[in-house]
UniProtKB/Swiss-Prot annotation:
The lineage of its organism: Eukaryota, Viridiplantae, Streptophyta, Embryophyta, Tracheophyta. PANTHER family: LEUCINE RICH REPEAT-CONTAINING DOMAIN PROTEIN, PTHR48051. Pfam families: LRR_1, LRR_8. Keywords: Leucine-rich repeat, Repeat. The keyword Repeat applies. One of its GO terms (biological process) is intracellular signal transduction. Belongs to the SHOC2 family. Widely expressed but at low levels. This is Plant intracellular Ras-group-related LRR protein 6.
Amino acid sequence: MERVLKSARESGSLNLSNRSLREVPKEVYNNLDTGAQDEKWWEGVDLQKLILAHNNLEVLREDLRNLSSLVVLNISHNNISSLPAAIGDLPLLKSLDVSSNQINAFPEEIGFATALVKVDCSNNCLTDLPVSLARCLELSELNASNNTISVLPDELAGCSKLFRLNLEGNKLVTLSDKMFMSWTMLTEMNAAKNLLTAIPDGIGALSKLIRLDLHQNKITLIPPSIKDCSSLAEFYMGNNLLTSIPEDIGMLSNLGILDLHSNQLKEYPVGACRLKLSFLDLSNNSLSGLPAELGTMTTLRKLLLTGNPMRTLRSSLVSGPTTALLKYLRSRLSSDEGASGSGSTPTKDDQIAAARRLSLSSKELDLSGLGVTSVPPAAWETNDVMKLDLSKNSIEDLPNELSLCSSLQSLILSNNKIKRWPGTVFSSLASLSLLKLDNNPLAEILATDLEALSKLEVLDLSGSASSLPEPSAVSKLPHLKELYLRRMKLHGFPDSLLGLKLLRILDLSQNYLTSVPEGIKDLTSLIELDLSDNNITTLPPELGLLEPNLQVLKLDGNPLRSIRRTLLERGTKAILKYLKEKLPAE
């Protein structure tokens, strides 16, 4: 023990886990001061990290306040039933792990530990969370799963920096709109295994939400506002009381996993067939058939349908390979179309007119895939359109009339034949926050070309190798949050990207990168980094400093030699932890 304490006096970090301790050594409460004659006090370091996990501790004394420099405290997996008020006298405490104890209440003094960033109080006996926790304005991760909490204090809405919240396995009946409207930074939320009966309409405010797990509740309805959760990639709603799902769910363009098993669904809406899912679980519902349009979901790899009273599908299709079922549905779709009336096909003018009518209420004009060679006048005839989709056409130039669309926030020009940067038009679109120009034969983009788009938050230039912006160009986009540069024939990581402090998603896949700069650590807002299909052989340890914000790191298709494949298969968290541990000790 003396050797461990001596080492801790030098490093400021003490790990006494798995030692069958029944009480905390008194030297710990004395900030490692043993009073030994040969100690040189000036060589000592205040205790900053204390790990007492997996022991038999029953009490944490008020003397804890002596450890005023403590940043990390882990007392998980003990027999502690209460926390001392002194927890509030730790002004530097950022991480508190009290999980797997017998704690039945937090002291109100927890609210004075205002530096707290991460709190794990899972697997305890808590019936509520203290109102004072709302004073911890830096709180970004809260795990209160597997307790008996029945209500959350409204004041928690003040913790606006929360990005990961786990409330699984409690007794929550409701979640308030006020909280959802405030927690706009949330990327991951788990409220599974509760008693929830509804999802608040305010869910739409969570535009950064990537994973939402609400399985095993008593929810009867998914609100249409779910369509505004534009980043949602995984949505788990199994074991609820749903009888239908909204058509608008089809607008979730990033959704890859949708779990709706064990509900009371009687139909799967045609609108939801627009989703680009890889996994869809509809098992144990009341479905008697499926829309033929579901066959167009070519991204679907797994579709589960067992436990439904299917009357329009053979059992061999229901239980067979997903690809066979999709092929059958597609064939039914084509035969249905052939048998529906006169066989006349709507003209382009009809399609444009219909799209314009829809845009009057939605403010979104979809003119994609019409095969037009120029922008139809419908695009600028109403100047209040906020989203314009002109993708998958053969457009070569943007007309100056498009400058009239002063309300335009999203402009999608993917998969066209645009060669020249439409600077005149873009300079008039002051509200533009999303621009997709991927897969166009664009010429070089100058730094001055991007100056007019200073409010841009999302930019996609993928597949346009000759249009790689000048090195200083992206620095003109200080608000950029998402940048997609797939298939750009990049041979080096653009240093100018390292100054984009708000960047949350960076896609550099399918290039020729051989390395990643140490400066990647400066992109502290990143939640997704795609480096797949490059020539990267090693990763800098500094990449590990992006944990825990970075949630998705894609590395497939690289000849990585410095990281074992077994580690790569364990996913982002394991990789970042490994890299972080390789950093030299300070």
